[in-house]
A protein has these predicted regions:
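Active-site neighborhood of phospho(di)ester-bond hydrolases with catalytic His/Asp-centered motifs
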Residues: 8-10, 43-49, 77-84, 111-116, ...
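Accessory, non-catalytic peripheral segments of nucleic-acid enzymes
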Residues: 2, 37-39, 227-318
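Conserved beta-sheet core of the metallophosphoesterase superfamily
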Residues: 163-232
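Conserved catalytic scaffold of divalent metal-dependent phosphoesterases
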Residues: 65, 86-176, 205-207
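Metal-dependent catalytic neighborhoods of phosphoester/phosphodiester hydrolases
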Residues: 17-21, 50-68, 87-104, 163, ...
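Active-site neighborhood of divalent metal-dependent phosphoester/pyrophosphate hydrolases
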Residues: 10-16, 41-60, 77-90, 149, ...
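N-terminal active-site segment of His-dependent metallophosphoesterases
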Residues: 1-68, 140-147
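Beta-strand-turn-beta hairpins that frame and shape the catalytic cleft
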Residues: 1-7, 118-128, 145-150, 198-202, ...
Length: 318
């Protein structure tokens, strides 16, 4: 098979027992998209952090990861690498989360590329820069031959940005270490972004599912790469359980919340962070009541923003 397309996911962060219904719905949307596309000459690549709690594992976690990898493999071959949340980087004697799961599945269509190395899969030359190995052992792009040299890495690359405005500063992991490759498919930073547009193109897919209020509501899903052109398209996966921040001033809910509540753009079952200023307790109670009319609210946290101290309003969020 000549692979022409790559589905690029990253940073799933499946919990031990929380949010599994939410994740299952998002994953099913992805699987339906892959099936709908009907691109037989494609592979699915997951760029690390499939698990969330490092080596703290639960039976439910094993079940969810096994289910997702198996369902993906029914549609396409699957390639995955290790993320820092899939292992304990501080104790190399501990086994990572993914090895026993993949070994138990014993599925020839699932390729777990745990170690640094060159892996030829069909017409693709995958080069893994494993976080479990020393950087000195990573082969350079120029030292490798191949029609499509694709570097797979999970880690913070210099000048990458997060949704909260933090910029990575790293002398160890710069874009220059990827010189000589055609494409670099990254995981670790949860904000979808392009670090370099060509020679090579270097891209973070971002988190598949919004993790918390520190991440923007949109920009979560996957990328679909065209191997020949070295280009990609962005595909968001709608999540009805998203994290929504609502800023209330003078007791007023912003108009955009009201107008977009039924647009299909906002989550229908949100976790709401309500930040308020110039608003008293009774007005907050009214605002929460109105929000619960607009949405099937999962939870509400309340924070005051017009003073230095931040406080939760007891009894209002139940």
């Amino acid at each position: 098979m000549k692979v022409e397309k790559i589905y690029h996911l990253a940073d799933l962060h499946i919990r031990n027992y929380q949010r599994h219904d939410e994740y299952r719905k998002v994953f099913n949307k992805f699987l339906k998209n892959v099936e709908r596309d009907g691109i037989e000459n494609s592979v699915i690549y997951i760029a690390g952090d499939i698990a969330h709690a490092k080596t703290d594992m639960s039976p439910e976690l094993v079940s969810e990861i096994s289910w997702f990898l198996t369902e993906c493999s029914k549609l396409r071959e699957v390639v995955l690498i290790t993320g820092n949340h899939d292992c304990n980087l501080n104790n190399s004697s501990r086994l990572d989360v993914l090895t026993p799961i993949v070994d138990n599945l014993n599925n020839k269509r699932i390729h777990y590329l745990k170690d640094t190395g060159v892996y030829n899969i069909h017409n693709l030359t995958f080069v893994v820069y494993s976080i479990l190995d020393d950087k000195e052992n990573w082969p350079t792009g120029d030292s490798i031959s191949g029609e499509n040299k694709i570097c797979l890495f999970h880690g913070p690359v210099n000048k990458a940005q997060t949704d909260i405005g933090y910029t990575v500063s790293s002398d160890s992991f710069t874009t220059e270490i990827f010189d000589g490759f055609d494409m670099v498919l990254l995981g670790d930073i949860h904000k979808r972004q392009v670090l370099k547009e060509s020679n090579p193109v270097i891209v973070y897919a971002g988190s598949t599912v919004q993790q918390n209020h520190g991440e923007l509501l949109d920009g979560h899903g996957y990328l679909l790469w065209d191997v020949t052109s070295r280009t990609f398209t962005e595909h968001d996966l709608y999540n009805e359980y998203g994290y929504l921040t609502v800023d209330v001033d003078n007791g007023k809910i912003p108009n955009w919340v009201i107008t977009e509540s039924n647009s299909g753009k906002l989550p229908t079952k949100p976790r709401i962070r309500l930040r308020y200023s110039n608003t008293n307790k009774s007005e907050i109670t009214k605002v929460i009541t109105e929000l619960k009319k607009l949405f099937n609210v999962v939870e509400v946290t309340v924070t005051r923003t017009d003073t230095v101290s931040k406080s939760n309003i007891g009894g209002l969020v139940n």
